[in-house]
Amino acid sequence: MYIVVTGAAGFIGSNIVKALNERGITNIIAVDNLTKADKFKNLIDCDIVDYLDKNDFIERIQAGHFDGEIDAILHEGACSDTMETDGRYMMENNYRYSMILLDWCLDQDVQFLYASSAATYGSSGTFKEERQYEGPLNVYGYSKFLFDQIVRQRLAQNPSSQIVGFRYFNVYGPRETHKGRMASVAFHNFNQFRADGKVKLFEGSHGYPDGDQQRDFVFVGDVAKVNLFFLDHPEKSGIFNLGSGRAQSFNDVAVAAVNGCRKARSESALSLEELRAQGLLEYVAFPEALKGKYQAFTQADLGKLRAAGYDAPMATVEEGVSQYIEWLQRNV
């Protein structure tokens, strides 16, 4: 029997594969699209039994090749570019593909865990897994939002089947180097500081001072742990926020990233005020392209996740970014 991870060469998917390996689990079929071939690097230190292109995998399950052979699908594959404007592509890639997998898993009684997104909330100031707080600002968010609505219907119709959706907030950490502009601000800050000796953040917007817009930043190691918790508990279903449960500023991320780099040089840590005074942090104009499409504040309500029994602490920005910078120093 196999465990399938889609998006396995991507950011979160490869961290899940590695977390499974650390448990001694290697009967993993990795599914992805390696058109952007550099992602293969995320799987070099992982153990899997097979790799399939995303389209080949769908064709094979529809042809019955995997009937009775899969225990669980962890569906992380998607286009996660919030700036993508091709709605037809987004809906086919994110929504329709997910629908095929969902219905196959229900038919086969296979555990189905999938990536949703905090983008489903849009500009809502309340981040609770309820329909009245949802209102995506872009087609990426809509593709995730619509699938979540179908999942709610399927859960009501199939109460004994496991379907779990994770509304990821701002995930950062190892194995995201292929993501380009969609990589985390921590990754961009690391690269900026290494190249230019300073980091850049957006000027104030939405009523927030420079760099003080706040997001729920969640370390990818915590994301992988939550996925495996639900894999261990097939009796638990639902759509769950997956963040740290706390909002922290982009300034906090910049301070942690710079100080992580300074630590590697045996230099002392600096405060935000010291970074500004020494010209190590500067602010750039808020992009026109993001106006009306930007979440200036997010903070996951973890009440439902905690009620489901997941009680491990989530890393703070200071803890997680410090670990991440150490990883980047070794691997990039």
UniProtKB/Swiss-Prot annotation:
<feature type="binding site">
    <location>
        <position position="181"/>
    </location>
    <ligand>
        <name>substrate</name>
    </ligand>
</feature>
<feature type="binding site">
    <location>
        <position position="171"/>
    </location>
    <ligand>
        <name>NADP(+)</name>
    </ligand>
</feature>
<keyword id="KW-0413">Isomerase</keyword>
<feature type="binding site">
    <location>
        <position position="294"/>
    </location>
    <ligand>
        <name>substrate</name>
    </ligand>
</feature>
<feature type="binding site">
    <location>
        <begin position="11"/>
        <end position="12"/>
    </location>
    <ligand>
        <name>NADP(+)</name>
    </ligand>
</feature>
<dbReference type="GO" id="GO:0097171">
    <property type="term" value="P:ADP-L-glycero-beta-D-manno-heptose biosynthetic process"/>
</dbReference>
<dbReference type="InterPro" id="IPR011912">
    <property type="entry name" value="Heptose_epim"/>
</dbReference>
<keyword id="KW-0119">Carbohydrate metabolism</keyword>
<feature type="binding site">
    <location>
        <begin position="76"/>
        <end position="80"/>
    </location>
    <ligand>
        <name>NADP(+)</name>
    </ligand>
</feature>
<feature type="binding site">
    <location>
        <position position="215"/>
    </location>
    <ligand>
        <name>substrate</name>
    </ligand>
</feature>
<dbReference type="GO" id="GO:0050661">
    <property type="term" value="F:NADP binding"/>
</dbReference>
<feature type="binding site">
    <location>
        <begin position="202"/>
        <end position="205"/>
    </location>
    <ligand>
        <name>substrate</name>
    </ligand>
</feature>
<feature type="active site" description="Proton acceptor">
    <location>
        <position position="179"/>
    </location>
</feature>
<feature type="binding site">
    <location>
        <begin position="32"/>
        <end position="33"/>
    </location>
    <ligand>
        <name>NADP(+)</name>
    </ligand>
</feature>
<feature type="binding site">
    <location>
        <position position="93"/>
    </location>
    <ligand>
        <name>NADP(+)</name>
    </ligand>
</feature>
<feature type="active site" description="Proton acceptor">
    <location>
        <position position="140"/>
    </location>
</feature>
<feature type="binding site">
    <location>
        <position position="39"/>
    </location>
    <ligand>
        <name>NADP(+)</name>
    </ligand>
</feature>
<protein>
    <recommendedName>
        <fullName>ADP-L-glycero-D-manno-heptose-6-epimerase</fullName>
        <ecNumber>5.1.3.20</ecNumber>
    </recommendedName>
</protein>
<dbReference type="GO" id="GO:0005975">
    <property type="term" value="P:carbohydrate metabolic process"/>
</dbReference>
<keyword id="KW-0521">NADP</keyword>
<feature type="binding site">
    <location>
        <position position="54"/>
    </location>
    <ligand>
        <name>NADP(+)</name>
    </ligand>
</feature>
<comment type="function">
    <text>Catalyzes the interconversion between ADP-D-glycero-beta-D-manno-heptose and ADP-L-glycero-beta-D-manno-heptose via an epimerization at carbon 6 of the heptose.</text>
</comment>
<feature type="binding site">
    <location>
        <position position="179"/>
    </location>
    <ligand>
        <name>NADP(+)</name>
    </ligand>
</feature>
<feature type="binding site">
    <location>
        <position position="188"/>
    </location>
    <ligand>
        <name>substrate</name>
    </ligand>
</feature>
<dbReference type="InterPro" id="IPR036291">
    <property type="entry name" value="NAD(P)-bd_dom_sf"/>
</dbReference>
<dbReference type="GO" id="GO:0008712">
    <property type="term" value="F:ADP-glyceromanno-heptose 6-epimerase activity"/>
</dbReference>
<comment type="pathway">
    <text>Nucleotide-sugar biosynthesis; ADP-L-glycero-beta-D-manno-heptose biosynthesis; ADP-L-glycero-beta-D-manno-heptose from D-glycero-beta-D-manno-heptose 7-phosphate: step 4/4.</text>
</comment>
<feature type="binding site">
    <location>
        <position position="170"/>
    </location>
    <ligand>
        <name>substrate</name>
    </ligand>
</feature>
<comment type="similarity">
    <text>Belongs to the NAD(P)-dependent epimerase/dehydratase family. HldD subfamily.</text>
</comment>
<feature type="binding site">
    <location>
        <position position="144"/>
    </location>
    <ligand>
        <name>NADP(+)</name>
    </ligand>
</feature>
<dbReference type="InterPro" id="IPR001509">
    <property type="entry name" value="Epimerase_deHydtase"/>
</dbReference>
<comment type="subunit">
    <text>Homopentamer.</text>
</comment>
<dbReference type="Pfam" id="PF01370">
    <property type="entry name" value="Epimerase"/>
</dbReference>
